[in-house]
Structures are given as structure tokens and as C-alpha cells.
């Protein structure tokens, strides 16, 4: 995955290559004086990627530790009318920073862009799609949920959680958070530039890193496919519970309408007038229980949407961000490294041709270009190894999240148990009220009996 093997670089040359790129990227074109607030944000940033003691490649987090980093709520606030169209704002509240700020979708877009710029070798979750014309409430609610999943995954990601960009996004209450985010991102290069171990990433990688990467990628692809199907089934189960609630409510309303009917009976039915009156009274009273049944079914559906489907979506978002990262590795730094090697080979052949043709000036120019290209290749090789280093850590992070499966299954089982228990209680409370519906000879109640009561044993 790294292209043609390069000769090992002496450590001073490696450090020099990294420092040269750091100097180049860390000093962008002047954009005017920086505000004192941005300086303050940078001072708060511990983000020179301080590594723990021991092997820095290995993560030591548990799922509970990641979940405890922060919980961020994203709630809709009433729509405001712009010049032409309405726009949606969100109230974003962080437990960790004890902050509550207003953000628009475009603020999330800029935050996503600067994260990708600073952390190109990490799992940056995707954003939900931009609003389309005629977007309905269902679309807006779905996007709110997706934004909440995005910001919680970011807030719990180890490098992101300690970065100034996250603190800015979650707690800056000024008028233009987008400008502040871009300004903060311009002040520093990407993670490769700021990580003290970037130039030595290769030293920490296992010898079979390429094999491990291929195996992990295949495993996570299979896990994603299975969880995608589980999410679809869970959505259908929750949707059926909500549909069941609507049907039960209509069922009860129709019983109530039947019991409230005041149409006079024909003369020949006068003998049964008292019976029909009792039946109507009973039917009318049943609507209360059916409304309660509908409420219980709706609660179960909503609970499974929040506790099961949303957690499945969160895990799928994480897995998708890992798949996206693998693609960035292959199409980004790896592809650039291979192109640099190819260009280097062409230059060598051109120099050999010029030497045979006895063209001293051409040879000298080509030698200078070859030296420059060697520096490019050295830097690209360092970036490639650092990308693999980050990929290895991100793979570990996915595995830290795997126990979320048990949380999801537990929530599903508990929801089913609680839902059926509550529904059963209402059905049992309803049954005695059916007594007047079963009037037999001499007004003796004769409700239908079960097969066991009839002495029939089902086969």
C-alpha cells in the first residue's frame, strides 16, 4: 500500500523533511492581525497531540470512557424567515463545556470542513444532506438527529475532543462562528504538522501493518453490512408499533362513534331496545381503553426509535466514517506518494538521456529537480506512514465502540418486555368491561370460551 519501497532515511533527514513542511504550512499568507480571542483559544489548545506514556500507537479507552467525554444535545428552535426562505436554527448544548449556543446547518458545514483539513487521517463523520426545496418536517427532524449523532461522535473522539476547533464550535457565542473556525484553522497546519511523533510513525507500526489494514477493512465492511440490515429491521419494527397505535386509536374512535349513534330503531326492533342500548353504552366506554392502548403502542415505537434505531444509526455513522477514511488513504496520500515515485523515475531517465547526449546544463537542472523530488517523496512517505499510524488507531477506536452492540440489544429487549407488559395490563383491564356484550338466555353472560375450556386440545 506504500508503493515502491524507499531506502530508510537517516533520522536527521526525516526530521528535516517534516520540519520543512511544517514551516511551510504553519506560516500562511498574512490575513491581517489576529484577534486576542483567537490567541486565547490557541493557548487553551493542548493539541500539539501529546501522547500517553508507553506505545503511543495503542489506545487505552473503554466505551464508557468515550461516552463520558461529553453528551451534546441538538434541538430545533422555531424557524426564522430570511429574505426569501425560512432557515432552521439549532440549539447545541454541551454538558462538558456547560454551554448552549445557536448554530445553523452551514455552521456545521464549515466545522466539518476545518476538521477534515486539520485531521485528514482521522474518522470525520459525514454530515446529513443540505436542505432541499420543499423539505418537510420529517426531513428536518431526520437531519436534526443526524447532526446530533455527528457532533456527539466528534465530541467523543480522542484527538477531536481536545482540539480548539471543537471548543470553539460548542462554546463560542459570538456573531460569526464560521469566521472564527476558519481563522483558527489557518493558524496551524494539519495533524501531521503538529504531532511530535509524525516523523517516527513508521517505528511504531507493526511489520504486517498492510495485512492488518486489509483484514480490518474487510471485517468492518462486513460488520457495516450486517448492522445496516439490522437498522432497517429495527426501523420497521418501530414503525409498526407506531402504525399499530394509530390503528388502535381509530378502532376505539369507531367503537365510540357506534356507541354514540342516535339513529332511531325500527318498530320491529323495539323488543331488543334495552339490549342494544346496553351494547352501545359498553362500546362507547371501550374507547378510553383503546386510546390508552394506542398511547402505550406509540410510546413503545418512539422508545425503540430513540434507544435502538438511533444507536444503530450512530454506530453506522462511525463505520461509514471509517470506510471513508480508508478511501481517503488510498486515493489521497497513497496515490500522491505513488505519483511522486513515478515522476521521480521519469526524471532519472531524463537525466540519463541528457548525460548520454552530453548536455551539461540539462543534467545540472535535472539533478536539482531530482533533489527536490526526493524531498517530496520523503515527505510523502512520512505522511503515508503517519496515515497508516492514524488508521491503526482509528481501527482500535471502532473496536472500542463494538460493545455498543450489547447496549442496543439490551435496549431492544427491555423495550419489548416493557411494551408488552404495559399493553397486557391494559388488555386485562379492558376484558371485564366486555361483560355486557355477551348477553345469553335470561341475561346470563356467556363470553366465548377458549379451546382449552371447550375440552379441545390444539395439535
Swiss-Prot record:
SMART domains: PX (SM00312). Residues 68-176 form the PX domain. It is a peripheral membrane protein. CDD domains: BAR_SNX8, PX_SNX8_Mvp1p_like. It is found in: Early endosome membrane. The modification Phosphoserine is found at residue 450. The keyword RNA-binding does not apply. The modification Phosphothreonine is found at residue 446. InterPro entries: AH/BAR_dom_sf (IPR027267), PX_dom (IPR001683), PX_dom_sf (IPR036871), SNX8/Mvp1 (IPR028662), SNX8/Mvp1_PX (IPR035704), Snx8_BAR_dom (IPR045734). One of its GO terms (biological process) is intracellular protein transport. Pfam families: PX, Snx8_BAR_dom. One of its GO terms (molecular function) is phosphatidylinositol binding. Residues 1-37 are annotated as: Disordered. A 1,2-diacyl-sn-glycero-3-phospho-(1D-myo-inositol-3-phosphate) binds at residues 104, 130, 143. One of its GO terms (cellular component) is early endosome membrane. The keyword Phosphoprotein applies. Keywords: Endosome, Lipid-binding, Membrane, Phosphoprotein, Protein transport, Transport. Belongs to the sorting nexin family. May be involved in several stages of intracellular trafficking. May play a role in intracellular protein transport from early endosomes to the trans-Golgi network. This is Sorting nexin-8.
